[in-house]
Design a protein with these regions (language model features):
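General beta-strand structural signal in soluble alpha/beta enzymes
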Residues: 19-21, 54-58, 97, 115-120, ...
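Glycine-rich nucleotide/cofactor/substrate-binding loop typically near the N-terminus or early
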Residues: 23, 28-30, 36-90, 212-226, ...
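Divalent-metal (Mg2+/Mn2+/Ca2+)-assisted nucleotide/phosphate chemistry catalytic cores
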Residues: 68-145
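Active-site glycine-rich loop that binds ribose-phosphate moieties when present
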Residues: 100, 129-142, 146-167, 198-205
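Glycine-rich, Lys/Arg-enriched anion-binding loops that position phosphate/diphosphate groups
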Residues: 158-189, 205
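Anionic-ligand binding region
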Residues: 185-211
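A C-terminal functional module that forms or caps the active site or interfaces directly
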Residues: 210, 214-278
Length: 298
């Protein structure tokens, strides 16, 4: 059911640094044809940091942990969005499935990968309980002993409510050199984090201590290097347009992203690409601090 790429298996077996990457971002996070390059750039950033990428997706009846460039190119807008509940059915039915953060965590956790990089995690949708929409990313993060590096929560969500739910689930929210949770495009203004860390090494130490105490996942919020502070009005406009058009469920995020790209003159897409790469680089640095083999050499 789970097929681990040879390189990923060898590095994991040797106690090396491996970082998981999702494929929903590749298939649905950017205009057709651009997501693959974003995924490849994340992989390049991980290798530059000294870690090995393990991009996760469902292909040909298997959950793949580690993809070739050709395999990554098969994840287009037609791919199913696959959360934790969908992995088995998608594989059995032979569909192409792009894994969400939650789906990626489920697969990565099953093979012992402890770090994941993404743009932003899912969470509580605005207007809850109408619609009653909460991402499965949160529950999977709570039960998987892994650290997720992101620019916070996706911009279209209710960030304070998501932070409250993470606290209820026992998920530490760390700020990378910041005291508040980054707001995806914006560097500051979110809820206070549970702890601030100043380095990849400190983040790794907190994560390892959390796991030694029986904890599950952690979120490490990294603010974007070049934040956009004027996006919130566009997000509200995009959500209103989605509601008026009858867009709901999993279709909301790509609809909103396309609206933001169009109305911002491409600034949001450029910022999104940059922060995804930045998060991958930091995730690679954290993975090096966690990897047993790297510790033995230091």
């Amino acid at each position: 059911m789970i097929r681990v790429a040879d390189e990923v298996r060898e590095v994991l077996g040797a106690g090396g640094a491996v970082v998981a990457l999702e494929t929903t971002l590749v298939a649905h996070g950017f205009p057709p044809g651009e997501g693959v390059e974003v995924g490849l750039e994340s992989e390049r950033q991980l290798r530059a940091a000294g870690a090995i990428p393990a991009t996760v997706g469902v292909l040909d009846g298997e959950v793949r942990v580690g993809l070739t460039e050709e395999e990554l190119g098969r994840f287009g807008p037609f791919a199913r969005k696959v959360g934790p509940r969908d992995l088995a059915a998608t594989a059995v039915q032979g569909s192409t499935g792009a894994t969400t953060v939650g789906g990626t965590l489920a697969a990565a956790g099953a093979v012992g990968i402890r770090v994941l990089a993404t743009g932003g995690i899912g969470g509580v949708h605005r207007g809850f309980p109408d619609p009653p929409d909460v991402s499965a990313d949160l529950a999977q993060l709570a039960r998987t002993p892994a650290l997720v590096v992101s620019a916070g929560v996706k911009s279209l969500l209710d960030v304070p409510a998501t932070a409250e739910l993470l606290e209820s689930l026992g998920v530490p929210v760390l700020g990378f050199r910041v005291d508040t949770l980054p707001l995806f495009y914006a560097a500051a203004g979110g809820p206070p984090v549970s702890a601030r860390v100043e380095s990849a090494e400190e983040a790794a130490r907190v994560a390892e201590a959390h796991w030694q105490l029986g904890g599950g996942g952690l979120l490490l919020g990294r603010p974007p290097d070049e934040p956009l502070e004027d996006v919130e009005p566009l997000v509200e406009e995009a959500l209103a347009a989605a509601a008026a058009a009858g867009v709901s469920g999993q279709a909301v995020t790509p609809y909103v992203l396309a609206h933001l790209h169009r109305e911002s003159g491409g600034r949001t897409e450029a910022a999104n690409k940059a922060l995804v790469a930045q998060n991958a680089r930091l995730a690679g640095e954290v993975a090096l601090e966690i990897a047993p083999a790297e510790k033995e050499q230091s």
